[in-house]
Amino acid sequence: MVSPLLANLYLHYAFDLWAARWRRREATGDMIIVRYADDIVVGFEKEAEARRFWDAMRARLREFSLSLHPDKTRLIEFGRFAAVTRRQRGLGKPETFSFLGFTFICGKSWQGHFQLKRKTRPDRMRAKLQELKDELRWRMHQPIPEQGRWLKQVVTGFFAYHAVPANGAALSAFRYHVTCLWRRSLRRRSQKDASTWQRVGKLADDWLPKPKILHPWPHQRFAVKYPRWEPYAGVPHVRIWCSEASCHSSGCKSRQHRSPVDAVVISSDVPIALEAWM
């Protein structure tokens, strides 16, 4: 096993520095590189460059005894113009991709303009709720205030990461399911327990935070953080983001790392994307 820290350092040299050099020397259109641990997203303005980078990346990784997982590597149409170009060719909606717990979707605003939306991945929410359910069984006989304080921490932590614009439905669903699990746990404490919906609803109002969007739209955050690097942050042609993603760029000669790497290559004007594992 290679520790996450060592794996991250390895990929910094094996991928990040090399990718940044490729962008400087080869890219003629916009190109954005995002990596968080072993998750990678690369955005392109031009489809041809996305395909050339994909080939070059495979060759680069082979030098370090790494390879892209064939089933988890995709080149997809995605971005501002993806829906229009696919509709002109008689195809369906643009494909989605997952990154750091979110599903990224080509959506529209209330005004009908393009809007990149992030939704909590259903499997991640189910896993979190199952974890909470198991913990509630252990805490079943704790005093209600103690349970309430713990559940408040759980819900607050979930919201702190997932409370992004356009994800309000997932926040409400998570809080609702937490309330249901709490009620079920209270009713199991005793056959005579009368934990009605009205009573548990009041407990939820007392202890569980209400759904609230906590993060700004990515273009607002990026425009402040990278005003020079990204002059068109307000009206992007290519935009890949994630609340916790950190951008790196890489090249190393060590051959110790063997863990899989996720990647997505996105092109917006000619919308294409690639998902990968090593």
What residue spans do the PLM features occupy?
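Non-catalytic terminal/accessory segments
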Residues: 1-278
